[in-house]
């Protein structure tokens, strides 16, 4: 069994340091955290880069064809492509099961529809010989999702604002960064 990111214990310890210092912090969320908290969390992540692998899929939703922009198509397809790539590199032959944990689907009235679409997409894209489960947990409940949030924020800042300050700190863990933008996006996404 392969457990996730060992830095989770250090994040838990830091969270308790903040609580003991009188800071009422429930969870880490990069965009909302104060600068000093954000910098410290990036320090903790950077100290454990050898223990993690980051794969990114960068896409502009507005550039894909209209039928793929619907949430029930876009997110399942993107997650499927990303997982297919990651699993082709990471999956060991002795793995009995793949457990995928994503952040909760924020669209309350569409949550069930999107979750079902994600399962259908993964069934088509993942190895038929492996059993898998996909769970949608609140990022508040899982330090691994909070680390993913920090990494995604750093990638977003790099692409959206040209600010690589935090990305530069985590890039050694970057195994792949796929860019599905504009015309290339349409060609790749419209293939079945």
Report each predicted region and the residues it spans.
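Phosphate-ester processing/binding pockets and catalytic centers
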Residues: 1-192
